[in-house]
Curated annotation (Swiss-Prot):
Its main location: nucleus. The keyword DNA damage does not apply. Keywords: DNA-binding, Nucleus, Transcription, Transcription regulation. It comes from Oryza sativa subsp. japonica. This is Putative B3 domain-containing protein Os08g0333500. Residues 1-51 bind DNA.
Length: 421
């Protein structure tokens, strides 16, 4: 259900609908709810390679007199800098050895700037950036950000996070979805007061907005990252990096691709799939697949939710270095195990990676047990909140509802929410 929020003095109040929400959901004292941010936002991204500075955009020629520019740079120009409504983001590949204690700041508030000898306004690193938890920034990146900050609007900032291996080309699109807060409010009051992280506050206007609350009390998939033991309204400092590819099906929301009560609603264009569906204990998903050097994660095969509709594309594969998308069937090559898997890798050797407990089952049809064949099409069916395979189904009813799809074809399947027991 929806409630109305009111922003007052840096805090939010659920001014309407809170009491009804508590009554309808049976929310008990001490249980948590999910605050689902529906406000559209886009965050621009700058990609750095493993050397952290070899792909820095070129400093505009008007500032050539600045002698502190990085030594190595390419001819990539800076354009489409964000406005005050769209914060910026920098993806920096860092290591624990380069930790800097002064590389973090928690505020979006403009800090008074200083002036250099030429009278131009400059902004410090802390005035330009705020870092995700456990994120370190190297001196050359700090220096570079301080330089390009002179060309940004004053309300623009970089949100600095870390990624695993570089699995995207420079010209690919990367989206950032911010995980919304876990809240615990008093169920006996008529209103619920809470605060949001400072970088989210910038996306809200000083008006009453309609938002969505979901309860996590009845989640079928317990998820340790909900951190139910932490204090109420404490920020969960996590981000979701999403790789996007060109798609004939632009969709509004990437939804329900992960565990219950951890839905992602990020406005975007083009089909995509977020990396946070990988198991939280996986430190480097690309290395877990096959070294991470010759695989583009979901570069050739793409999938994503379009509201309550699933859109899936299967691309043909022609070469040992081309990625493919497959997943183990409950009856093919997995000993009948009743767990979903999503797999990405290159042919031969079964170099696939999967996850348990997600909402999607997807795999390529295969004649041999335990192997996905190159170029085979994908056939899926969404039934009862799951995606089932196009072949080898024991139920004639399910098998009759889908047909073969040519490799590269797009199709949409209506999603049915699972019935509550």
């Amino acid at each position: 259900m929806t409630v109305e929020l009111e922003k007052i003095a840096g805090s939010f109040f659920i001014s309407k609908g809170w009491k009804t929400f508590v009554h309808r959901t049976g929310l008990l004292s001490g249980q948590y709810i999910r605050f689902q941010v529906l406000t559209p936002s886009k965050i621009n991204v700058l990609l750095f390679d493993k050397k952290k500075d070899s792909k820095l955009p070129m400093i505009p020629s008007s500032k050539k007199q600045i002698k502190t520019a990085p030594k190595r740079s390419t001819g990539i120009t800076i354009n489409d800098m964000p406005t005050s409504k769209h914060a910026s983001m920098l993806i920096s590949h860092t290591s624990n050895k380069e930790t800097s204690s002064d590389s973090r700041t928690e505020s979006m508030t403009d800090i008074p700037s200083s002036s250099d000898n030429s009278g131009e306004t400059t902004r410090s690193f802390d005035d330009l950036c705020f870092c995700a938890r456990n994120t370190a920034v190297t001196p050359d990146i700090k220096n570079y950000i301080s330089i390009i900050g002179q060309f940004l609007q004053r309300s623009s900032k970089f949100y600095i996070v870390t990624m695993n291996n570089t699995f995207m080309k420079q010209d690919r699109l990367c989206k950032l979805s911010l995980l919304t807060n876990m809240l615990m409010c008093d169920v006996l009051t008529d209103t619920c007061r809470f605060t949001l992280p400072s970088f989210l506050m910038a996306f809200f206007q000083n008006t009453v907005q309609t938002q969505t609350l979901t309860t996590c009390a009845d989640s079928p998939y317990p998820y340790e990252h909900l951190r139910k033991t932490e204090p109420a309204c404490r920020e969960i400092d996590e981000v979701t990096l999403t790789m996007c590819a060109h798609s004939p099906y632009p969709y509004e929301y990437l939804r329900k691709t992960e565990l219950a009560c951890r839905e992602i609603d990020e406005v975007t264009t083009g089909a995509s799939l977020s990396t946070n569906i990988l198991p939280p204990y996986t430190s480097s998903p690309l290395e877990a697949i096959s070294g991470g050097e010759d695989i583009w994660w979901l570069a050739a095969s793409r999938m994503g939710w379009r509201g309550d509709v699933a859109a899936v594309q299967a691309d043909s594969v022609d070469g040992n270095n081309s990625p493919f998308l497959c997943a183990r069937s409950p009856t093919i090559g997995n000993g009948g195990a009743d767990q979903p898997y999503l797999m990405v890798g290159k042919p031969h050797g079964w170099p696939c990676w999967g996850w348990d407990g997600a909402e999607m089952w997807l795999w390529c049809q295969s004649k041999n047990s335990g192997h996905c064949h190159i170029g085979w099409p994908v056939g899926v069916l969404v039934k009862g909140g799951r995606i089932y395979p196009g072949g080898g189904l024991p139920s004639k009813e399910l098998a009759g509802m889908i047909g073969p799809y040519a490799s590269g074809d797009w199709f949409e399947l209506k999603r049915e929410l699972p019935a509550k027991a």
